[in-house]
Amino acid sequence: TFAGQASTLVNRMLVSGLAEGSLAALNYATRLMGLVPGVVGTSIITVMYPTLSRLAARDGWSRYSKAFSESIKMISFVLVPTAVGIAVLRVPIVRIVFERGAFDTEATKATAWALLFLSPAVALFTLRDMTNRAFYALQDTTSPMVVSIISAGINIVLNLILVGPLAQGGLALANTLSSAFGA
């Protein structure tokens, strides 16, 4: 969406004013964080979306609501502990995955700093995507779009506030907090 692209543009402009390597650290942390929702989250959503669509079309609100609630519980049960684990083990994770050659200890620290603030997004991004699919199952495409625009606005404001005190970690935290609104 345009709002998402504007948010990304502001993010890139702000990170370009930070220390050398900040953009790379943020990108590497984002890649690591995106693996779990990309694999686990997508699997859950792929299974639940057809069920939600069928229930929304035929079986009424009660069963649809229960199925949606169960999918949120399942996502939370799997991904909240995963997010905590990533936050706690962020330095060894980054070291094992990336630290070699030009990616030195300082790059590990910078990436782990961003990953700390992105780790809750492991669950939040999947919850957001599940919620969007729940709206789509109801034939409602407007609500996710409105939420996306508001989330992008929140992200831009938080980027401006948090980049100073937290550097690339602030940009990561802004992304996480704005995704919490969308979840």
Model-derived regions, located:
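Membrane-embedded alpha-helical bundles of multi-pass transporters/translocases
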Residues: 1-183
